[in-house]
Amino acid sequence: MMKDMKTVIDLFERSCEKFPDNPYLWEKKNGKFAATSYMEVKREVLNFAGALCQLGMDREDRIALLSEGCNAWVYSELGMLYAGGVNVPLSIKLTDNEIVFRVEHSQARFLIVSANFLNRVRGIEGRIGGVEKIIVIHSDINEGKYVSFELLQREGEIWRGEHKELLNDRIRAVTEDDLVNISYTSGTTAE
């Protein structure tokens, strides 16, 4: 059974088939924890993959992700993988200089940030010139480089409906040899 599963996408798809209505994620909303099923997560993941394709993301593009743990973090990471992108996760504990180094060194084209850390990103924006779009989770921002994650989700859903085969081709092109993550450890920067 495991021999057929060669990518993270394969593993996730298998879980969606086996447990479609089971809770996959829990997130606190309005003071109470609410479950999101595997199939609901998959829909959000595909919407984000579609949004990335609509933005012009190419296979193997790097996408930095600076956020506390939340459902959108999972949608983002899996959506990147479905679209053939490479996740560059950034700890919220990093200094501004460490964020700049990782974003620049990884050559990230896109940066996903939660609204809680938006001011930090605004403070370093001039130092991360390779980033073309900054996607903000839990925000309604839509100005210049900045765009709301939630808005992209809606646009991604529309794009997906109009370009189903393009997205399916993108997903089928993902192989077990693809780079999916660039993780910087404490010794990575040689500082």
PLM region spans:
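AMP-dependent adenylate-forming
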Residues: F12-T36, I137-N142
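Structural core segment of the AMP-binding/adenylate-forming
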Residues: Y82-E155
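AMP-binding/adenylate-forming domain of the ANL superfamily
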Residues: M2-Y24, R43-E44, R62
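Conserved AMP-binding/adenylate-forming core of the ANL superfamily
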Residues: Y24-V74, L78, T95-V100, S148-R154
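Conserved S/T- and glycine-rich ATP-binding loop of Class I adenylate-forming
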Residues: I63, M80, L111, L179, ...
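Conserved pre-ATP/AMP-binding loop-to-beta segment of ANL
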Residues: P20-P23, E157-Y184, E191
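Short, conserved catalytic or interaction motifs in soluble domains
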Residues: E68, I92, G187-A190
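A broad, structural micro-motif
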Residues: A35-T36, V147, V174, V180
